[in-house]
């Protein structure tokens, strides 16, 4: 996740004119949540409902310990927290099983609405998430350290819809730049 968030920070820090359109990135990783944000639920029902300024605006569910959450820690104090930034992040720390209280749709229903997915795995023996994206006609970015990425690189001369970024122990900054460039 670090290289994905770093790529979003790189996009947000770059010239806004470089982006072809605004970017809304969802980080959908279950974490220690204690239920959906009440203010967000109210806003989804009524666009005039007030948002709670004491809650981090980039999150869909309350966290049991937001001060210890690595994703919040990573985006805090960056342009990703700026509501005027052309790059926005929404952290969804809940299983998307159709009853999360915010989306109330399962993962696959939400996946179909994505323009692209990013799974910059450092290591996954196979890594089904990029495969699921392609199965739902959503282009994906993965790495040469994920089994699926390796398989695509080895078996598909033209792998349209799947970008495989070369990743190793020493090239995180290059991976960040390549992901940012691909999203751009």
Segments and roles (model prediction):
Residues 19-20, 111-112, 134, 157:
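A structural signal for short secondary-structure junctions
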């Amino acid at each position: 996740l670090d290289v994905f968030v770093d790529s979003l920070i790189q996009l947000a820090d770059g010239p806004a004119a470089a982006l072809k359109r605004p970017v809304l990135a969802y980080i959908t990783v279950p974490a220690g949540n204690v239920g959906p944000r009440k203010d967000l639920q109210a806003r989804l029902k009524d666009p005039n409902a007030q948002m709670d300024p004491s809650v981090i605006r980039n999150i869909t569910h309350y966290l049991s310990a937001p001060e210890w959450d690595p994703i919040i820690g990573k985006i805090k104090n960056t342009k990703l927290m700026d509501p005027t930034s052309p790059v926005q992040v929404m952290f969804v720390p809940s299983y998307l099983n159709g009853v999360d209280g915010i989306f109330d749709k399962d993962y696959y229903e939400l996946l179909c609405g994505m323009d692209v997915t990013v799974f910059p795995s450092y290591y996954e023996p196979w890594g089904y998430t990029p495969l699921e994206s392609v199965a739902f006609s959503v282009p994906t970015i993965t790495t040469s350290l994920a089994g699926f990425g390796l398989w695509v690189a080895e078996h598909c001369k033209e792998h349209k819809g799947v970008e495989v970024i070369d990743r190793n122990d020493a090239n995180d900054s290059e991976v960040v730049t390549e992901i940012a460039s691909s999203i751009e």
